[in-house]
Amino acid sequence: MNSLDLPGRPENTRIVVAMSGGVDSSVVAGLLKREGYDVVGVTLQLYDHGAATHRAGSCCAGQDIDDARRVSETLGIPHYVLDYEERFRKAVIDPFAESYVAGETPIPCVSCNQTVKFADLLATAKELGADALATGHYIRSGANGAHRALYRPVDADRDQSYFLFATTQAQIDYLRFPLGGLSKPQVRAIAEEMGLTVAAKQDSQDICFVPQGKYSDIIAKLKPAAANPGDIVHIDGRVLGRHEGILRYTIGQRRGIGIASGEPLYVVHLDAERARVVVGPREALETHKIYLRNMNWLGDGPLGDIPEGGLELFAKVRSTRPPRPAVLRYVAGVTSVELADGESGIAPGQACVLYSDDGNEARVFGGGFIERSERGAEAEAMLTKLAARPAQIPAE
C-alpha cells in the first residue's frame, strides 16, 4: 500500500485533486505531486461569479479559478475547469432558497459536498481514470475493516467534519484527505516552501454564492414570497409589530429584530405558513430533544440495530462547538437525539452530527438534518396555542 492506502506505486496511481484555488487544496496537490503521484487538478465553476470575482474571501470565484490554474502550472500538473453552474443552481442554490422560505436555516455547504463535489465531481474523477479523489478538507479517514471511516482532524480549530456528515460510505472509500494530520500553520508553511502564490491567501468566508454576504438578497430574488411582510408576535400571543420578510430572521437572533421591548427578546420560531416571526425570552429557546431527517448513519451495523434504550455518543448542532454528550434513538423509522446538556437556538434545517467521543481522534458516525425540536413544556404549549391563531395586524 502507498501513502494513500492504495495498492501500487505512486507513479502508477492517478489522483484527481479538487482545487478551489485556496491554499489547502493547492498544498494537497503539491504534496501528492512531490510524492510522485499522477496528479490531475480539477476546479468547478459553480455559479455566476461576476459579483464575487474579486471579492476578498469569496470561494470558487473567477480569481480562484485563475489561482488554481497558476498553482497547477507551478506544480507541473494538468488542470481542468468544469462548468457545473446549472447543476449547482438546481442542487444547492434553489433548495437553499426554498429552505429559507419554509422558515428553516439551511447549510448549503453540506448540500454542495453531498450533491456536487462528492457526487458529480467524484464521478468525473472516475471517468478520468483516477484511483481516488483528494480534497483539502480538514478531516481524516482511515481503514475500518473492509471500508474506511471518517475521523476528526488533528487541528480542532479547522475541523470540517460537521459539513461532511452526509458523505456516503461509497464516497468515503474513494475519497482521501491528506490535510487531516496537519495544522493550518503547517499547511501555509508548506505552501511557502513550495513557492505557491496562494500561501498567504485569505480563507474563504460565508456562503460562496452570496455577494457581500447578503443572503437575503439572493433569497428575495429567487423566492419573493420570503420577503412578504407579517407579524412579529410574542410567544405569549401579543402582536408586537411587523416585519419585512421571515428571510431576514434566524432562530436565536436577538439583534435587529425591529421592535422595542423592556425585556431581551430572541427569535424563537419562524412560522412560514403565516409569515409570522415569534419572539420570546431566552429560556424559550432551550432544547433537549431533536428529530432528524435524511439520516446518514456511518456507524458499524444498521441504524435499526442500535440498542432499544438508545446509543450513548456525542453530538454537535453547530460547526463551531465541540461534540457534547447525547443519546441517539431510532424507533419506528424516526431518528431522535437527546442532548444531555441542552442547546439554545436550534433551528430546523441545521445539521446534527454524531461522534464516538469528544476528542480530536473521534470517529464521525454521520448525522442528519434537524426536522424539529422539543422545547420545555411551557414553551411547547405556548407555541401550539399560537399556531392555532390566524395572523393579525397590530393595533395602531
Swiss-Prot record:
User: What are the alphabetically sorted keywords of the record?
Assistant: ATP-binding, Cytoplasm, Disulfide bond, Nucleotide-binding, RNA-binding, Transferase, tRNA processing, tRNA-binding
What coarse category fits the chief subcellular location reported for this protein? cytoplasm
Which EC class is the enzyme in?
A: transferase
Q: Which GO terms describe its biological process?
A: tRNA wobble position uridine thiolation
> Region Interaction with tRNA: what ranges?
158-160
Q: Which GO terms describe its cellular component?
A: cytoplasm
Instruction: Report the EC number(s), separated by commas if there are several.
Output: 2.8.1.13
Is Phosphoprotein among the key words of this record?
no
UniProt: ATP binding residues: A18, M19, S20, G21, G22, V23, D24, S25, L44, G136
**By its UniProt entry, which InterPro entries does this protein fall under?**
MnmA-like, MnmA-like_C, MnmA-like_central, MnmA-like_central_sf, Rossmann-like_a/b/a_fold
* Coiled-coil annotated spans: none
According to UniProt, where does the site described as Interaction with tRNA lie? Answer: H137, Q350
Q: Where is the active site?
A: C112, C208
Localization, per the record, is: Cytoplasm
Q: List the disulfide bonds.
A: C112-C208
Does this UniProt record's set of keywords contain Mitochondrion? Answer: no
Which one of the record's GO molecular function terms can you name? tRNA-uridine 2-sulfurtransferase activity
Spell out the Pfam families in the cross-references: tRNA_Me_trans (PF03054), tRNA_Me_trans_C (PF20258), tRNA_Me_trans_M (PF20259)
Catalyses which reaction(s): S-sulfanyl-L-cysteinyl-[protein] + uridine(34) in tRNA + AH2 + ATP = 2-thiouridine(34) in tRNA + L-cysteinyl-[protein] + A + AMP + diphosphate + H(+)
What this chain does, per the record? Catalyzes the 2-thiolation of uridine at the wobble position (U34) of tRNA, leading to the formation of s(2)U34.
Q: Which family does it belong to?
A: Belongs to the MnmA/TRMU family.
Q: What is this protein called?
A: tRNA-specific 2-thiouridylase MnmA
| Provenance organism | Mesorhizobium japonicum (strain LMG 29417 / CECT 9101 / MAFF 303099) (Mesorhizobium loti (strain MAFF 303099))
